[in-house]
Each structure stands twice: as structure tokens, then as C-alpha cells.
Amino acid sequence: MISMGDIITYNGCKDNKWMLEQLSTLNFNNLHVWNSCSIGNVTRIFYTFFSYLMKDKLDI
């Protein structure tokens, strides 16, 4: 389960492998955890994820 501390660290780009594992294991069994997140946290999580995917192309 994702704790609030993990979410804060997650938004800070904790670990790319861990981030990918969390996204790949997203399913109906843990949606209640995600529903407890604010929309801002969810937005930042995906912003961080896509920034990581695009960093080679954007050279940031």
C-alpha cells in the first residue's frame, strides 16, 4: 500500500523502477488507495512519470 509519505517521495522522483512498478500494478484491488490521493498528487505523479519518459528527447 502507498502511504502519504511514499506519495510525497514518489512526487520527488524516488526511484524510477519503483515508480514503474507502481504504475504497472495499478488495478482495481488498489484503486481505493489511489482514490484517497488528491487529484493534485495524481497529476504530479504522472507529470513526473512523463517527464522521465521524455527527458532524453527534451534534454532536461
From Swiss-Prot:
Q: What triggers expression?
A: Expressed in the intermediate phase of the viral replicative cycle.
A Gene Ontology term for the protein's cellular component: host cell cytoplasm
Does the UniProt entry include the keyword Lyase? no
The principal location of this protein is: host cell
Signal sequence span is none
Record Pfam families: E7R
Is Transmembrane helix one of the keywords UniProt gives this record? no
Q: What is this protein called?
A: Truncated protein OPG069
Question: What family name appears in the similarity comment?
Answer: Belongs to the orthopoxvirus OPG069 family.
- Any idea which UniProt keywords this protein has? Host cytoplasm, Lipoprotein, Myristate
What organism does this protein naturally occur in? Variola virus (isolate Human/India/Ind3/1967)
Q: Where in or outside the cell? A: Host cytoplasm
Please give the InterPro entries that the UniProt record associates with this protein: E7R_orthopoxvir (IPR035345)
Q: How is it modified after translation?
A: Myristoylated.
